[in-house]
Amino acid sequence: MEEIQRYLQLERSQQQHHFLYPLIFQEYIYVFAHDRGFSRSILSENRGYDNKSSFLLVKRLITRMYQQNHXIIFSNDSNQNLFWGRNKNLYSQILSEGFSFILEIPFSLRLISYLEGKKKKIVKSQNLRSIHSTFPFLEDNFSHLNFLLDILIPHSVHAEILVQTLRYWLKDASSLHLLRFFLNEYCNWNRLITPKKASSSFSKRNQRLFLFLYNYHVCEYESIFVFLRNQSSHLRSTSSGVFLERIYFYGKVERLVNVFGKVKDFQENLWLVKEPCMHYVRYQRKSXLASKGTSLLMNKWKCYLVTFWQWYFSLWFHPRRIYINQLSNHSLEFLGYLASVRMNPSVVRSQILENSFLINNAIKKFDTLVPIIPLIASLAKAKFCNLLGHPISKPVWXDLSDSNIIDRFGRICRNLSHYHSGSSKKKSLYRIKYILRFSCAXTLARKHKSTVRAFLKKLGSELLQEFLMSEEDVLSLTFPKASSTLRGVYSSRIWYLDIICINDLANLK
């Protein structure tokens, strides 16, 4: 760690380009990356890993990489590749750990230098990491807007384009050249940045490099919004990220000015996309750009974004990845919710002297609903019910103790209720609780070779109260001193600031 700090101080003091290639041959880099815990469980499966991850091994790997025939290195048949041999998984794991740790250094330096130059301080708050912190932003702003650009960030990009993009940030040809060799070993780039298509073995072995490259790729697409935000002071944006998003929002404006300077008549055509009220939010590959303008303005935005991304990344960006929807009659699938802006009618009685009359007012309200059909599909995939939503037993858990079975069902139920506490209509969650309740009862009845009715009649319904805890009980336990003042609050929307990931029903032990 001291070696890294000395290197960073030397790099920052000299203010030179980031020559990271010598760090690849430093053993403490791999030890430090290993101790970060990104793949600790997988690394522990290889006995003697710390002995294998040495300076001599890394140097030998890189030397052999450059000496190999290009026809062998770029071969599609991984079994015929003589470079990796039998230890392909271990070698790629070692190099990916080193790459991921070393590539983060210039981004950290840029962030530190910007903060020192601007003398700004970032408020460190874990609450800003919560997924639920995005919804108050949507409530405050989206209810006043009209149109929405529903954007799906593309994932298909060639490895060479990524390396060329990294050259804007990283001025080290040797490191980029070695990274190009490593990426070409996995010639299918979709496997690198598409979580659904990535093989489990690759994503586990290269999880840190996987996340870094994916976030970098996504942030490159977001770079256009950073530039336009400085052109129009009313362009407001937020992003549900921690590391790379801050760097791009702080330090990428200068390079974007140079990049956009190459586009002919860019400044003259900027008025086409200027809008006094624009809001942008993104989570993973799903992003939304809302506006108070007209349909014509949103079509100009769509055309502009497609043209820019095609020119900047040198790839085909299909216009159908951007949908123009009207917020008043469209529901946005975002972060496990169905969000929409609906008209909330309100009748006010007014009386002047002896005359009284009614005034009908329609107020726009941001509405969030629980997507019941996708939730039932997730429960069916996890074998808690069938596709029609009828509860079934969980035979995989039949060998566990009764208390362990009830605890697992209760934890799933509480997590779902906790995450969907921001729903406008919580009655839809009753069906989910019903499925989990009777699935738990069916599992226990099957274990004891009895029927569900006889099992509940024998043991009583109190056995299942643990995972049927209501939101009011959760608030009472969370705020015991203010339990009397919180009556009725549980019926409204509640956003928790301790949720950092979407509940995955398939990720069960």
From Swiss-Prot:
Keywords, comma-separated and alphabetical: Chloroplast, mRNA processing, Plastid, RNA-binding, tRNA processing
InterPro entries listed in its UniProt record: Domain_X, Maturase_MatK, Maturase_MatK_N
An example molecular function term from Gene Ontology annotations: RNA binding
GO cellular component: chloroplast
Statement: the UniProt record of this protein carries the keyword RNA-binding: yes
Keyword RNA-binding: yes
GO BP terms in the entry: mRNA processing; RNA splicing; tRNA processing
Localization (cell): Plastid, Chloroplast
Job of this protein: Usually encoded in the trnK tRNA gene intron. Probably assists in splicing its own and other chloroplast group II introns.
PANTHER family: MATURASE K
Family membership noted in the UniProt record: Belongs to the intron maturase 2 family. MatK subfamily.
Protein name listed in UniProt: Maturase K
Organism in which the protein naturally occurs: Verbascum thapsus (Common mullein)
Gene: matK
